[in-house]
Amino acid sequence: MAATGEALTPQGYIQHHLTNLSVGEGFWTWHIDSLFFSVGLGVLFLWLFHSVGKKATTGVPGKLQCFVEMIVEFVDNSVKETFHGRNPVIAPLALTIFVWVFMMNFMDMVPVDWIPELAMAAGIPYMKVVPTTDLNITFSMAIGVFLLIIYYSIKVKGVSGFVKELTMQPFNHWAMIPVNFLLETVTLIAKPISLALRLFGNLYAGELIFILIALMYGANWALSTLGVTLQLGWLIFHILVITLQAFIFMMLTIVYLSMAHEDH
């Protein structure tokens, strides 16, 4: 598969699958495929949960309602065990993060050539279908969490309390203010960076492994047979990875917001 219709080398095949459909240049580059799939999956999540909630019954629930209730209960229990403040926004936020990130991660389970081949048939040269393999997407979510951390830190502690937290911890002495400020600022900035890079790194690596396995199908029958076995094994293992990464992103968000609500 190639944008030009010519056969690709293994290196070109990998590069093609890791290239976004984009417009613009430099800082103003927009990754159309990442935006399309992330927004589309977000809308699908909202529609699905809204529909289930609207049709929910106190009688014998259907399979979909049971599944949704199980997810909601799991997230709600996670919030109750981790978040020590009182904020009605946290549980819905955690639910949105967990399901949305999982759905974006789940796109990695689709065979790597299926959607790009359909896009090629429609005249679209590139199509990267896993939004969480795009740093722009993971950083945008992490920055959103970071802004909430700042907002609730100031709301709960006040401006003076937030400034005091940055300047008087961990060493509670005026002479250590520069050191405290440096340490606390680095710690604060590290939160969104670690959130974004952890999710991106794990999903990008998983996608790359699927691409490398797909390359084996174009070799000989022995490698093709091995590729089938490897793909099945990695598929099963990767289900755990995509679920775990969604859970970690959700839990770290809850922990960070819980820390923001702690008034020292």
From Swiss-Prot:
UniProt xrefs under Pfam families: ATP-synt_A (PF00119)
GO cellular component, one term: proton-transporting ATP synthase complex
The keyword Membrane belongs to this UniProt entry's keyword annotation: yes
Superkingdom: Bacteria
UniProt keyword terms in alphabetical order: ATP synthesis, Cell inner membrane, Cell membrane, CF(0), Hydrogen ion transport, Ion transport, Membrane, Transmembrane, Transmembrane helix, Transport
InterPro entries in UniProt: ATP_syn_F0_a_bact/chloroplast, ATP_synth_F0_asu, ATP_synth_F0_asu_AS, F0_ATP_A_sf
Molecular function (Gene Ontology), one example: proton-transporting ATP synthase activity, rotational mechanism
Sections of the chain in a coiled coil: none
Transmembrane residue ranges: 32-52, 89-109, 134-154, 177-197, 208-228, 235-255
Membrane topology: Multi-pass membrane protein
Main location: membrane
Record's subcellular location: Cell inner membrane
GO biological process: proton motive force-driven plasma membrane ATP synthesis
Family in the record: Belongs to the ATPase A chain family.
Function: Key component of the proton channel; it plays a direct role in the translocation of protons across the membrane.
Self-association state and partner proteins as the record states: F-type ATPases have 2 components, CF(1) - the catalytic core - and CF(0) - the membrane proton channel. CF(1) has five subunits: alpha(3), beta(3), gamma(1), delta(1), epsilon(1). CF(0) has three main subunits: a(1), b(2) and c(9-12). The alpha and beta chains form an alternating ring which encloses part of the gamma chain. CF(1) is attached to CF(0) by a central stalk formed by the gamma and epsilon chains, while a peripheral stalk is formed by the delta and b chains.
HAMAP family from the UniProt entry: ATP_synth_a_bact (MF_01393)
UniProt-recorded name of the protein: ATP synthase subunit a
Organism (species): Shewanella piezotolerans (strain WP3 / JCM 13877)
